[in-house]
Every structure is written in C-alpha cells, then in structure tokens.
C-alpha cells in the first residue's frame, strides 16, 4: 500500500506538468469557453444546436484544441482523486475478507445445531404418536368387539344389496333395501357408519329406477330391431291361414309335398309272423327344414318380455306405478310415430313390404303386452294408438302409392296391403278405413287401366285395314269365332274363303275389353265385396271403358277418312254394340260362375247407347263424304248452255257419277238398313239439288233448247238409277221422288204448258205442284235471253212470239204475289 501511494505521486506531478504546459500553449476565447460550458451542462437533445453553432463560427480546429485541453484537465483531476483514495480501498477490502471467513464458520455451527435439534424432536414426536395410537387401538378394539355382533347383519345385508345391484337383480335389491331400512338400521342407528350407509343407500332407489328405465329402453330398442321380423312371421301365418295368394294347384302341390315328407319318416317292415310293422324314423333334417323351423316362431320367441314384467314389479314396489304406465304409453306412442313414418323413399316394392311388416310387428307386440300386462295399456289406449297410426298409414300410402302409374306395381301393393289388413284384423284391430283406401286405389287402378286400353284402342284404330276379315281355313274361322261372339246362320256351310262383315279391329277391341275386365277383377279380389257388388262394379268399369272408347272413336272419325273407312267403322260399331250382351255374360261368368249366366235381375246393364253419338258422327261424316265426292264429280261438268241439239246420250260426268254411286251403294251391304237408306236418299237429294243449282245458277245467262234437252237427258239417267238402286230395302218410287221437283220444272219448260201451270197453280192436284213460279221465271228468262241473242229470231215476223213470252213472264210474276 505505501508503495502504491509513493508510486502515484510522481505520476500526479507529471500530469500536472503536462496540463500546465498545455494550458500555457493553448489560448481559449470567451466564445469557446461558452461552447464548452454549454456542452457540459446541456442535455443530449440540445447538443446538436451547440455543435451547429460551433460549425457556424468556422473555427472548428481551435474549438477542437480547446476541447482537448478541457478533457486533459478532467483526466488529471480524476487521477488525483484515485491516487488519494487507493490505499484506503485496499485496506477495506482486506478487512472484508477476514469478516467473510468468520461469518462462514458461525453459519456452519448454527446449521449443525439445528439439525441435531430437529432429529431429537422428530424422534420424540414419533414416540408420542405411537403411544397415543396404541391406546386408541386398544380402546377401539374393545368397543368394536362388543358391537360387531350387532353390526354384522347390517353389513351382510348391505353387501347383499351391492351384489344384487351388480347382478342387475333390482327387484330383489329393493326388497333387501326395505329390510335394511325398516329392520336392521334401526338397531344401530346411533353409529355414524349407519348414517354413511343410509346416505349411500338413499340414491339406490333412484338408481334402480334409472336402471329399470334403461332396461325398458333397451327392450324398446330390441322391439324396434325385430319388429320387421315379427310382422313378417305374423303376415306369413295369416297368409297360410287364408291361403292368401295360393292357387288351387299350388295348394294341392303343397299337400302332396307334406304327405311325401311325412311318408319319408315311416319305414315299413315285415315281422317274423308275417305282419306289417311301421317304424317311425327320425332322419337328420337338412338345412332347409331347419330354416323353415326357425321361421315358425312367434313374438315371444323373438322378444324377451321379462324386462316389462320386471319393470312393473319394480315400479309397484317404488310406488311409481302410474308414473311407469304413463312413461310406457308415451314411449310406445313415440315409437309408433317413428314406425309409421317411412325412413326412406317408398320407391321400391321391398320398401312397402318392410314398412308394413314393421307396423304389424309393433302392434303384435302391443297386443302381447296388453294380454300379459293389462295394467300397462288398456284396449282403449291400444285402439287410440291404432286409430292415430291408421290415419297416418293411410295418408302415407295414399301419398306415396296412390299416384303410381304402374298397374303391376299397384296389383302387388294391393296384395301386400290386403295381407296387412287381414293380419291386423286377426289381432282385433279395426281395418275398415284400409278397405276404403283399397277401394280408392281400385278407382285409380281402373283409371290407369282405362287409359292404357284407350291408348291400345286408338292404336288398333290406326293400324286397322278397314277390310272385312277373310278366312281361308276352318282353323282360322274357329280362331275368329273364339275371339268374338259372332253367329250367322248357315255361315259354317259356306265354302272357303269365308268373309266376316267386320274388320280385325272388332276382334282386337273385344279381346282388349275382356282383358280390361279381367284386370279390374284382379284388383277387386278379396276386397270384402259380395258377388253382386263386384258384378255391378265391373259392369260400371265396362261402361266407363266403352264410354272412353266412344270418345276416342268420336275424335278419330273427325280425321280425313275415306268412304271405305267410314263405312267399315259404322259396321264395326254395330257389332261392338251387339257384343255388349256377350260382355255382360262374360262378366257374370267371372263374378258369379257359369251357372249364373242369364240371371240379369238387379244388375247394372252394359250401355249400348254410348256409341250412338259416335254412330251419328260417323253417319254425318258418311253424308259429308258422299256429298263431297258427288260435288267433286259434278264440278267436272262443263255444260254448253247454247248447245243447238242434245248429244243423244248422258254427259260423261253423269256416267261417272252413276258408276260411283253403284260401287259405293253396293259396299253398303253390311251397313244397317236404316243408315244405308238414309245415305242413299240424302245423296240423291243432294244430286238433285246440285243439278237444280246448275240450271238456276246466276252465272248461266241463257239456255238453248238443245242444252235443256241434254240436261233433261242427264236427269233422266239419274232417275233411271233410282229405279235400280242396289241398296236393299229402298223403295224406287220414293227414291225417284228426290228428282220430282227438277223433273216437273223441266217438263213444264220443255212442253211450254204454261196454261195448265197458271190454271192449276196453288192447287193440291196440280200437275206441276212442285214447281214454284219464281223458279219457272228464272228458266224462262234464260230461254228468252238465248232467243234474243239468236240472229233474227226476234224479227218482224216473230213479234207475236216475243209478246207471248213476255205475257207468260208477267203472268208468272203475278202468281208470286
């Protein structure tokens, strides 16, 4: 330390010397002093301003030297202070090191003493605790030995209760719990452990109730899983009982198979004395028979109803019988709502079957529970549940199945729904609304059938050749007779080829009608309808079909059909009308049997009148077609009204017209007599009117005597045709009267018998009764016009004839007044 002090003194002296020398050589202005003062005293934020001011003075080097001088001065002062205090610092550090060593020794001694005290205290506490524990053990053991005999029954029963709870014997656990509470706990209730037991047993009832509810929910879930199988077996049993969907042939085959199966179990042997001995054999059954036996199960075999009985017992003991009954009904109602609500789209036949099987299974289980636990559900509750389900079932089936356009699908579903009805009915459920649903489906089914057969009817109309059927052999003849009920005396003796009056369309339509009726009967099978109701319904369906067919025909005949087509349609209509009687007999044979044919009392009669409107339309079309064809031929007429003399033979168009009439009227052989007469008469009237229009047409300005003779000759040809008309039953005299008006007019004008006409005009016995004065005037004026045009006809010598004709015209005009 002294050395250090002595060493620092020379250094200080040297520093001061250096500083003094620096001060002596550096001069510092007042401005530099100010700047240094500012740098020493100002904060860092204002330092930039001071530095900028220094640079602004322009004497940076002088300031740098002044700054260096100031730094050197401060360094010297720091060295002085350090040199002055250095020895004292060294002495203080040496004393501090000594004090540290002493403190460490004291600390170690203190820790050792504390550890020893802790060990001694711990051993003392352990000894004390052991003494206290042993004394308590001795006392408690003595007390326990005295009271254990009293507590053992409680503990044994409690253990029994726990075991029963773990084994899910809840009803027995309830009985044990009651014994504990009312018998054993009362004897040891002063002990605290009994309170613990009582507290632990308090939630046992609630736990048992929850477990019972859980077990019942599992039972409901199991019902939901196997409801479809139960319903399937129940439906199968019902189908077997009612021989549902089994024909007589299938039933006989099944009986034979059962007999053969039973016979295979018997072996016949001859004993020693010669007698026959039967031995029952028990062969191993194959897998198929085992599967059949497995299917012969009931609801009791598929479902264990024990949980229901157990829950009833448990809730009776708990005093919550009404609560469980209400819970049961609510759960079954919710489950019923789930069952009757389809879980998928009903777009498959299998889906419909599964849906109805689940419903059957649900209500079969409900019926079984009602029989075994009558307190859970009553007949009223069951009926209410069924009524609600029935309404929704009907809605779902009607919504999802009612609009089905598939006839085969509807027939299949009808059988499924009918089997569902019979199954539910066998369990005592009301099924009348389902029969109503089937009847609604029947109407929809019939409507679909009608549309299909109407479409087929229209196709048959389009493809028909409208030619009478011709057969070339006995086999073909019998085929047509089997298809359509046609009878004609002595037709079987006619040589081949034989011709029927109707076209193939009639046999096709009659066959389609029978197929339609058979289709209607298929849906009505087993619908709880008596024979009379079925017969009436089928007849109404037949009338509907005939009415629709009449509508199709009515639309068809408005197309542009030929005369041959119209005539054949009329003939076909006649035979279709006649076939209604045979259709009625066919319906009776299908609904009441062959022996009931001929009994028509209280039956809906097949309406033959449905084709009347169509017949009228066809007749009108025939009239129009005839008039149109006649007009086409007459339009070919090209009269030369100034012809000087007649040609001596009928005009060409008249010959064509008569040939056409001859051919057409000949084809009317199979037409109804009245229609043929009507068409013939109306056609002749139309020809007469058309010829009159020719003669009286305003376009014809003049008529020569030769033209009038030719016109009269043409009319005469028409009159001759009426006398030999090929239409059977037509009175030639009556038919000739269609040209009477025209003939009297021609006779009057050509004979110039005006005196007779004027004298007898308006009288009943007049010779020219059918001639009107106005008509005669028109023809006469045209003849006068022709004479006027003729060269020199009205010359001086002919003045008297002109006056005569003018006088006749004036007299005729007076007759009109």
Swiss-Prot record:
Any single GO CC term annotated in Swiss-Prot or TrEMBL for this entry: exocyst
Record's keyword terms, sorted: Coiled coil, Exocytosis, Protein transport, Transport
InterPro entries: EXOC6/Sec15, EXOC6/Sec15_C, EXOC6/Sec15_C_dom1, EXOC6_Sec15_N, EXOC6PINT-1/Sec15/Tip20_C_dom2
Recorded family membership: Belongs to the SEC15 family.
Described purpose of this protein according to its UniProt entry: Component of the exocyst complex involved in the docking of exocytic vesicles with fusion sites on the plasma membrane.
Subunit structure: The exocyst complex is composed of sec-3/exoc1, sec-5/exoc2, sec-6/exoc3, sec-8/exoc4, sec-10/exoc5, sec-15/exoc6, exo-70/exoc7 and exo-84/exoc8.
Protein name: Exocyst complex component 6
Organism from which the protein derives: Caenorhabditis elegans
């Amino acid at each position: 330390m002294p050395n250090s002090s002595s060493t620092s003194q020379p250094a200080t002296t040297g520093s001061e010397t250096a500083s003094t020398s620096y001060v002596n050589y550096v001069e510092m202005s007042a401005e530099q002093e100010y700047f240094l003062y500012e740098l020493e005293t100002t904060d860092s934020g204002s330092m930039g301003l001071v530095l900028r001011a220094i640079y602004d003075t322009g004497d940076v080097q002088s300031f740098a030297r002044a700054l260096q001088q100031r730094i050197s001065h401060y360094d010297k002062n720091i060295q002085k202070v350090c040199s002055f205090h250095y020895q004292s610092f060294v002495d203080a550090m040496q004393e501090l090191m000594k004090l540290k060593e002493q403190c460490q020794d004291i600390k170690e001694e203190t820790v050792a003493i504390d550890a020893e005290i802790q060990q001694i205290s711990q051993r003392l506490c352990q000894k004390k605790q052991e003494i206290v524990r042993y004394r308590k053990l001795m006392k408690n053991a003595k007390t326990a030995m005295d009271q254990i005999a009293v507590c053992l029954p409680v503990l044994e029963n409690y253990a029994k209760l726990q075991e029963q709870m773990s084994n899910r014997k809840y009803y027995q656990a309830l009985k044990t719990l009651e014994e504990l509470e009312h018998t054993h706990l009362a004897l040891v209730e002063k002990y605290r452990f009994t309170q613990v037991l009582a507290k632990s047993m308090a939630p046992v009832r609630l736990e048992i109730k929850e477990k019972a509810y859980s077990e019942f929910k599992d039972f409901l879930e199991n019902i939901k899983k196997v409801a479809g199988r139960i319903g399937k077996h129940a439906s199968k049993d019902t189908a077997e009982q009612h021989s549902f969907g089994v024909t007589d042939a299938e039933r006989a085959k099944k009986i034979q198979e059962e007999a053969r199966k039973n016979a295979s179990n018997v072996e016949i042997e001859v004993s020693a004395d010669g007698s026959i001995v039967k031995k029952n054999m028990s062969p191993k059954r194959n897998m198929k028979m085992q599967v059949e036996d497995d299917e012969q199960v009931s609801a009791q075999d598929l479902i264990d109803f024990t949980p229901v009985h157990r829950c009833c017992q448990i809730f009776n003991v708990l005093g919550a019988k009404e609560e469980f009954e209400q819970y049961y009904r609510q759960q079954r109602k919710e489950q019923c709502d789930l069952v009757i609500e389809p879980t998928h789209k009903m777009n498959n036949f299998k889906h419909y079957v599964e849906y109805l099987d689940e419903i059957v299974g649900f209500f079969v289980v409900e019926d079984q529970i009602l029989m075994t636990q009558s307190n859970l559900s009553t007949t009223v509750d069951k009926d209410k549940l069924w009524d609600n389900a029935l309404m929704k079932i009907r809605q779902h089936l009607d919504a999802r199945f009612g609009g089905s356009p598939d006839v085969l699908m509807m027939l299949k579903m009808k059988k499924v729904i009918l089997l569902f009805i019979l199954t539910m009915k066998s369990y005592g459920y009301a099924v009348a609304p389902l029969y109503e649903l089937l009847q609604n489906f029947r109407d929809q089914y019939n409507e679909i059938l009608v549309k299909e057969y109407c479409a087929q009817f229209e196709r048959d109309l389009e493809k028909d050749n409208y030619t009478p059927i011709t057969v070339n052999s006995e086999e073909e003849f019998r085929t047509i007779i089997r298809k359509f009920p046609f009878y004609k005396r002595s037709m079987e003796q006619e040589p081949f080829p034989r011709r029927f009056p109707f076209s193939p369309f009639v046999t096709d339509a009659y066959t389609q009608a029978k197929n339609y009726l058979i289709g209607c009967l298929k849906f009505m099978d087993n619908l709880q309808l008596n024979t009379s109701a079925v017969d009436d319904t089928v007849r109404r369906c037949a009338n509907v079909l005939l009415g629709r067919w009449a509508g199709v025909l009515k639309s068809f005949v408005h197309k542009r059909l030929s005369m041959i087509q119209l005539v054949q349609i009329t003939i076909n209509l006649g035979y279709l009308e006649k076939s209604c009687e045979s259709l009625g007999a066919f319906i009776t044979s299908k609904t009441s049997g062959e022996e009931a044919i001929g009994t028509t009392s209280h039956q809906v009669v097949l309406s033959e009148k449905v084709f009347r409107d169509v017949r009228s339309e066809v007749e009108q079309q025939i009239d129009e077609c005839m008039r149109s064809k006649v007009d086409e031929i007459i339009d070919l007429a090209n009269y030369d009204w100034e012809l000087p003399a007649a040609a001596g033979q009928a005009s060409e168009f008249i010959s064509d017209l008569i040939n056409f009439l001859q051919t057409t009227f000949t084809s009317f052989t199979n037409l109804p007599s009245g229609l043929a007469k009507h068409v013939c008469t109306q056609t002749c009237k139309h020809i007469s009117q058309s010829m009159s229009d020719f003669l009286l047409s305003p376009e014809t300005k003049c008529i020569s005597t030769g033209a009038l003779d030719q016109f009269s000759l043409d009319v005469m040809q028409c009159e001759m045709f009426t006398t030999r008309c090929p239409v059977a039953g037509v009175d030639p005299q009556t038919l000739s009267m269609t040209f009477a008006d025209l003939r009297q007019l021609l006779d009057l004008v050509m004979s110039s018998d005006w005196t007779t006409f004027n004298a007898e005009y308006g009288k009943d016995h007049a010779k020219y009764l059918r001639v009107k004065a106005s008509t005669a005037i028109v023809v006469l004026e045209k003849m006068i016009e022709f004479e006027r045009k003729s060269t020199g006809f009205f010359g001086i010598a002919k003045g008297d004839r002109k006056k005569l004709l003018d006088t006749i015209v004036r007299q005729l005009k007076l007759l009109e007044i």
